[in-house]
Structure formats: C-alpha cells, structure tokens
Swiss-Prot record:
Record GO cellular component, one term: photosystem II reaction center
Gene that this polypeptide is encoded by: psbZ
Organism ancestry: Eukaryota, Viridiplantae, Streptophyta, Embryophyta, Tracheophyta
Database matches in HAMAP family: PSII_PsbZ
Keywords associated with the record: Chloroplast, Membrane, Photosynthesis, Photosystem II, Plastid, Reaction center, Thylakoid, Transmembrane, Transmembrane helix
UniProt-recorded name of the protein: Photosystem II reaction center protein Z
Gene3D superfamilies tied to this protein: Photosystem II PsbZ, reaction centre (1.10.287.740)
Amino acid sequence: MTIAFQSAVFALIAISFLLVIGVPVALASPDGWSSSKNVVFSGVSLWIGSVLFVGILNSFIS
C-alpha cells in the first residue's frame, strides 16, 4: 500500500509541475484561452482527482 501511495504522490507532483508550466504557456499562445480551454480544464480535473485519490490513500496509510 505504501508503494501505491508514493506513486500517487509522485503522479500528483508531476501533474502539478506540468500544470504550472503548461497553463501559462497555453494562455500565452497566439490563440489563447479559446483554443486551450479544454486542455486546461482536463488538466485541472485530473489534478483534483489526484488530490482526492491521494487523500483517500492517505487515510489507509495513517
């Protein structure tokens, strides 16, 4: 169970890093918000799901 928790935390960190880099780049592109809206919303949804998943796994570890 610990390895699953560590993997989930690593995935959360990786997704966070990608969003920190990717969202400003997507918004600064010439097409801006209109072309990258779906990608940003998908990334944020994945991040929220990862936070909830890590929280659930944390309740089993502690």
